């Protein structure tokens, strides 16, 4: 089964990330405080939202978090959450990715479609790509990172070198 979302292009995700940064009073900050955003700002923006930090054994080893639309919750593995607090780039991106799912699925009301034909959706219809792109735009806004190297982006935005390179390629 393939899950397909309503199409949304990067330019709209970029605008949404910019709006979230503005609403959170972090529009010009290179280092976006994702933990503070999820803990303090998301409950103000989305009153039914809550975050649950789960024991590492709650998820299978390769799963770091989940967004459960019906429960209005993001569940994140404890080691990932603690890593995000410490500023570990991959863990910050994971938390931003789950926040991206939440915003797109709960707050924006995007629809899912299921296909049993096994085709891979175009990136702009793939909910994983959408959350990844929104997370990247939130943590590494294009207008602030333009002209920087991937190493500079990773350092000032608090993301992994891989995430920085990916974002740089979309400026």
Describe each region flagged by the PLM:
Residues 1-171:
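Active-site hotspot residues in diverse enzymes, especially metal/ion-binding acidic/histidine motifs
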């Amino acid at each position: 089964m393939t899950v397909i979302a309503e199409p949304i292009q990067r330019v709209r995700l970029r605008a949404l990330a910019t709006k979230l940064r503005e609403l959170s009073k972090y529009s010009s900050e290179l280092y976006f405080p994702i933990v503070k955003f999820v803990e303090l700002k998301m409950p103000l923006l989305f009153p039914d939202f809550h975050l649950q930090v789960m024991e590492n054994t709650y998820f299978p080893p390769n799963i770091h978090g989940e967004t459960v639309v019906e429960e209005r919750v993001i569940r994140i593995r404890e080691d990932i959450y603690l890593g995000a607090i410490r500023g570990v780039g991959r863990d910050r991106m994971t938390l931003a990715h789950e926040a991206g799912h939440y915003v797109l699925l709960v707050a924006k009301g995007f629809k899912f479609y299921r296909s049993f034909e096994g085709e891979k959706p175009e990136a702009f219809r793939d909910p994983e790509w959408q959350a990844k792109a929104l997370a990247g735009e939130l943590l590494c806004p294009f207008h602030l990172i333009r002209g920087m190297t991937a190493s500079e982006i990773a350092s000032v935005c608090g993301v992994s070198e891989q995430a920085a390179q990916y974002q740089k390629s979309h400026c």
